[in-house]
Amino acid sequence: MSEFIAENRGADAITRPNWSAVFSVAFCVACLIIVEFLPVSLLTPMAQDLGISEGVAGQSVTVTAFVAMFASLFITQTIQATDRRYVVILFAVLLTLSCLLVSFANSFSLLLIGRACLGLALGGFWAMSASLTMRLVPPRTVPKALSVIFGAVSIALVIAAPLGSFLGELIGWRNVFNAAAVMGVLCIFWIIKSLPSLPGEPSHQKQNTFRLLQRPGVMAGMIAIFMSFAGQFAFFTYIRPVYMNLAGFGVDGLTLVLLSFGIASFIGTSLSSFILKRSVKLALAGAPLILAVSALVLTLWGSDKIVATGVAIIWGLTFALVPVGWSTWITRSLADQAEKAGSIQVAVIQLANTCGAAIGGYALDNIGLTSPLMLSGTLMLLTALLVTAKVKMKKS
């Protein structure tokens, strides 16, 4: 695809950035992220309304990640000759449809179907987002355009959980998803108005993506990515029941905790470039080690609200290094195949999200309230050890 993009650039001679299109892509990304994480802050009322346990309701996150995993790997190959403009419009339609199906769900099955639609949009869009952005601006402006996309991600992560918690208490969880559907409609119209025709990849450009895993240190890196994100979702998916029952937070208190978590994540993302300049490998090993210690502290002393709030802030600040750090690892260690490596990374992250949320939910329902924390801490510790021992890092 990278060769095709280069050819296309030469043919189209992009001289001026299409900022309206870039911002439409960023807005779509933000909406996808917000809707992906809405169940985290609405888990309890969703479970009560549908007559299921919170652990089962958490599988609405699992199915989204599971479908997104396959979408990220195969959608770009399936639609390689299709104009990307129409594909992005389709993803925005799926986002809107997902929100409506969830808001009108009267059964767990319909809820899962709605969340599966989101998974298709999420995985497919993420697999294409970088290459889309590169085709909307001149080469010199690509870093700035990508910063707009990832800035939208950071903002979405800041507001998703606390906004969902606040609005869920105010208007009910179903109306929260109805409001999200309105955002989806705005995505559709903005994309139709601003995104130009972007021809798909010719069939002769097709290459074997998975061959990258044979390179030294790449498989270890992907396993480390899997464990770190599985550990994150084993904890974060169930932050509402853990914090409300372990630390005794009410809805208002939980909203403030989630807001603090989001702000800390935004700050961590903003500071990550300075930390990664010093040592990417140290960041990739040190961040999960800090998170493992944080999980232990929350398990032992989480009944104290100050401790619980502090852990949430530290967690948000520290985990922000993880996705940025692994993206930096890919651009340095797999620079010649960064797009294909990115597709594998998205699939690994979504598989990790699936497994983390699923096993965390099982542990919550069958072992105990703090079991998702212990699972998360163990995975983070293993990640730190694996990065230290096996992950290779090329110098910039």
From Swiss-Prot:
Induction / repression: In stationary phase.
Regulation: Reducing the electrochemical proton gradient across the plasma membrane by the addition of the protonophore carbonyl cyanide m-chlorophenylhydrazone (CCCP) leads to a drastic reduction in the rate of inosine excretion.
One Gene Ontology cellular component annotation held by this UniProt entry: plasma membrane
A single MF term (Gene Ontology): antiporter activity
InterPro entries named among the record's database cross-references: MFS, MFS_dom, MFS_Efflux_Transporters, MFS_NepI, MFS_trans_sf
Cysteine pairings via disulfide bonds: none
Membrane topology: Multi-pass membrane protein
Domain of life: Bacteria
Effect of V293L: In strain: BEN2908 / O2:K1:H5 / APEC
Pfam families (alphabetical): MFS_1
Transmembrane segments: 22-42, 55-75, 86-106, 108-128, 148-168, 176-196, 216-236, 256-276, 282-302, 306-326, 344-364, 367-387
Database matches in CDD domains: MFS_NepI_like
Knockout mutant characteristics: Inactivation of the gene leads to increased susceptibility to purine ribonucleosides.
UniProt topological domain (Periplasmic) ranges: 43-54, 107, 169-175, 237-255, 303-305, 365-366
Record localization: Cell inner membrane
Biological process per Gene Ontology, one example term: transmembrane transport
Keywords: Antiport, Cell inner membrane, Cell membrane, Membrane, Transmembrane, Transmembrane helix, Transport
Cytoplasmic side of membrane: 1-21, 76-85, 129-147, 197-215, 277-281, 327-343, 388-396
Record's catalysed reaction(s): inosine(in) + H(+)(out) = inosine(out) + H(+)(in); guanosine(in) + H(+)(out) = guanosine(out) + H(+)(in)
Entry keyword Membrane: yes
NCBIfam families per the UniProt record, alphabetical: PRK10213.1 (NF007578)
Family, per entry: Belongs to the major facilitator superfamily. DHA1 family. NepI (TC 2.A.1.2.26) subfamily.
Entry function: Involved in the efflux of purine ribonucleosides, such as inosine and guanosine. Adenosine may also be a substrate. Confers resistance to the hypoxanthine analog 6-mercaptopurine, however the level of resistance is rather low.
Protein name from the UniProt record: Purine ribonucleoside efflux pump NepI
UniProt organism field: Escherichia coli (strain K12)
Encoding gene per record: nepI
